[in-house]
Amino acid sequence: MRWRVPGAVVAAMAAVLLVAGTPPPTGGGDTAQRVDIGGGRSLYLRCSGSGSPTVVLLSGLHEASDPWSLTDTAPPVPKAPAVFPGVAAFTRVCTYDRPGTIRYTQPPALTTRSTPVRGTRTLPAMVQDLDRLLTAARVPGPYLLVGHSFGGMLALRYAQEHPERTRGLVLVDALGPALKPAMAADWAAYVEALRHPGTPFDADPEFEQVDIDGGVTAIDRGGPLPPVPVAVLSKTEPFAAPPTMSKDLLAKLEAAWPKAQQALVGMRPQTPHLLATGSDHYVQLHDPDLTIAAVRLIADRSAAARP
């Protein structure tokens, strides 16, 4: 979920060649393709690098895969690399466009790289899409899932449903299920603000809409996470407020967010909690080197934990 796109970030985007048809195995090399997942639908998938585990980058609500290939840093944080190429330097990495998400183009636009889906989507259905995509594209598992914001909910639910295919988790200022009780009576207003964040696409029937409340329930009822290493990265600076969120609601969100982050840390023992000091919600843009380091840490821990 992002409500502002820095001009420098937009200018950094480059066009990517789309390849249709049956994909080759994505065990190495750079690929960018529309993958048939069945039911007359395809999803855009981009992969790079080689090695194991395969890292899967999951974007926040309403966001295409673009943020993982961009940076918006300030000294002393280096300008490059972005998370996607930075992770590709030491292992295989993939990311994809969910239907109805916003591209970081100029001007911003809904992605045309994945088949549109109308109506509100459930978290289990989105996890099913992801699993079908990885299977159809023959992306080698198991996977280290990196989820930003709402992407963290996808990562958690995927790990619950597919523990045998999950190697580790990195949660980047992720939206966790504990945010609901932390916000209490203000939760419904927050979810409504997520549904209508004040973008030019709010009224578009193909704009991504998700049953966030049902997603929280699915995770709460999904049982424990598999015994894999986890890292949590959290912001220290305020959210960029959407025009549809009141100052009072934003203040309550800021007060509740650290409690929900700490709950994520408590989901698995010995989970490192990394504070991206000076960063807002978009840790992967402002602190790509910290995000990459967290991915490498969990990749190393997962390798050490293998029998």
What is the meaning of each model-derived region?
Residues M1-P23:
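Secretory targeting and sorting signals
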Residues T26-S42:
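N-terminal cap/lid segment of alpha/beta-hydrolase-fold proteins
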Residues I37-R41, R46-Q106:
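Conserved HGGG/HGGXW glycine-rich cap/lid loop of the alpha/beta-hydrolase fold
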Residues P124-P142:
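Conserved acidic catalytic loop of the alpha/beta-hydrolase fold
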Residues A137-A178:
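Conserved hydrolase catalytic core segment
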Residues V170-E208, T244:
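Flexible "cap/lid" loop of the alpha/beta hydrolase fold
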Residues M245-T277:
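Conserved loop-alpha-helix segment in the C-terminal half of the alpha/beta-hydrolase fold
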Residues P269-P307:
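Catalytic active-site module of serine/aspartate enzymes centered on a nucleophile-bearing elbow/loop
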